[in-house]
Amino acid sequence: MTKPIVFSGAQPSGELTIGNYMGALRQWVNMQDDYHCIYCIVDQHAITVRQDAQQLRKATLDTLALYLACGIDPEKSTIFVQSHVPEHAQLGWALNCYTYFGELSRMTQFKDKSARYAENINAGLFDYPVLMAADILLYQTNLVPVGEDQKQHLELSRDIAQRFNGLYGDIFKVPEPFIPKSGARVMSLLEPTKKMSKSDDNRNNVIGLLEDPKSVVKKIKRAVTDSDEPPVVRYDVKEKAGVSNLLDILSAVTGQSIPELEKQFEGKMYGHLKGEVAEAVSGMLSELQERYHRFRNDEAFLQKVMKDGAEKASARAAETLKAVYEAIGFVAKP
């Protein structure tokens, strides 16, 4: 029986965080045995905001090494860089012609990013969801792991696929969202009602996977809790968002359940909780960073992973693009 195809990706434009790891990358790793996983470093999406060329190249290799350090295995999964497979951009252009201006105008992420990057509201930023649809549909993807911030984009991908299929027959699989049962939603350290984001301007809100352990300890000790007197370590996202976030992080790292942790910290101060979280996170990151540096220093291996991954991805992508071009009436290349 053929395994269902899973597609996901991350931009190389910012350092990945513990939120990316606990909420997504760890799930990607766990899916490798049961699914045919295709994981992409989406460098073409990254240039919708201005990038320094040298930094983008470095960040792409850094991200690849982090994928590997987190446990994504090139023997089990297809790992590649988006710009190495030209079919992404080719299908993206074709799908532009089956996507309505009004649909893109309603995308909340475009509104957010255009407010943030007001000096560079480019067509690529507006068109980003169509390239994302191409990324997904190119591989006849069955399942897409999505967070809250990408649900709207996946809905658009489904709409485009159904519209195209309605015109030309069953060219595309219509992808379904995959929402893992487990996976911590890690929030900002100082603003625990919003999700931790690698693009946050306030770096005290964020813990990067490559961050120095001393810096990690400092940030966690400064994390927002609350002013309850006496302090109560209790899981209550609405009333105690900061404490709940720290409990979520500790649970994700140690595997202990929230009720177990509540019992462990009964009658203790918030400082005790922060100390345990800091120790657990810095320990986890030390091990991950050791693996990261081993991969990052082996450039020949990284080049091989990229080359092999692009070849595997291209073979599958070419089949889909051929079917699309034939359906819309392009003359086949002699």
Swiss-Prot record:
Keywords on record: Aminoacyl-tRNA synthetase, ATP-binding, Cytoplasm, Ligase, Nucleotide-binding, Protein biosynthesis
EC id: 6.1.1.2
Keyword flag Cytoplasm: yes
Record-linked SUPFAM superfamilies: Nucleotidylyl transferase
Enzyme class, broadest EC rank: ligase
Annotated residues for binding of ATP: Q11, P12, S13, G19, N20, G147, E148, D149, V186, K195, M196, S197, K198, S199
GO cellular component: cytosol
Annotated signal peptide: none
Catalytic activity: tRNA(Trp) + L-tryptophan + ATP = L-tryptophyl-tRNA(Trp) + AMP + diphosphate + H(+)
Domain of life: Bacteria
InterPro entries: aa-tRNA-synth_I_CS, aa-tRNA-synth_Ic, Rossmann-like_a/b/a_fold, Trp-tRNA-ligase, Trp-tRNA-ligase_bac-type, Trp-tRNA_synthetase
Motif ('KMSKS' region): 195-199
Predominant localisation class: cytoplasm
UniProt-recorded Gene Ontology molecular function terms: ATP binding; tryptophan-tRNA ligase activity
Family named by the database record: Belongs to the class-I aminoacyl-tRNA synthetase family.
Oligomeric and partner information: Homodimer.
Name of the protein: Tryptophan--tRNA ligase
Protein source organism: Salmonella typhimurium (strain LT2 / SGSC1412 / ATCC 700720)
Gene: trpS
